[in-house]
Amino acid sequence: MADSSFDIVSKVDRQEVDNALNQAAKELATRFDFRGTDTTIEWQGEEGIILVSSTEERVKAAVDVFKEKLIRRDISMKAFDAGDPQPSGKTYKVIGSIKQGISSEDAKKVTKLIRDEGPKGVKAQIQGEEIRVSSKKRDDLQAVQALLRGADLDFAVQFVNYR
């Protein structure tokens, strides 16, 4: 019997993030408590998001609105990193970013976790920004997925390319 395998990745669907951003912008424009605060949310490059408002409290509330929209669109909070409010002239701004990919340090932690706590006979190999997990038994692969879902990792994980 051939080996079964799957890949562990940390990717975010940019279109879903864009939809969440547009929904948040619409809510910020229409909500009563944001009237007159000139609160905006927009993309900054490919991975960055910038939120601007007249007060520190309103910019924090805008971040909460955006996080709520991300959750509704099934995007993990581990994938969004919001900075601290920074004064910028008469306004406050928060620069956030969308984190994608598994760093080499995180990949080493995951492979060590699989080796130490996973079923015997499971192999984990680092391939760039993803990790390939293979085994002779599919049940072992499902046990590894359950292990990783239960683990407290610093990044969002998805399982793709199941063979």
Swiss-Prot record:
Keyword Nucleotide-binding: yes
Record key words, sorted: Nucleotide-binding
Molecular-function annotations in GO: nucleotide binding
Keyword Mitochondrion: no
GO CC aspect terms: cytosol
Family annotation (InterPro entries): DUF520, UPF0234-like_C, UPF0234_N, YajQ-like_sf
Matching Pfam families: DUF520
UniProt-listed PANTHER family: UPF0234 PROTEIN YAJQ
Protein task: Nucleotide-binding protein.
Protein family: Belongs to the YajQ family.
NCBIfam families named in the record: PRK05412.1 (NF003819)
Descriptive protein name: Nucleotide-binding protein Mflv_5248
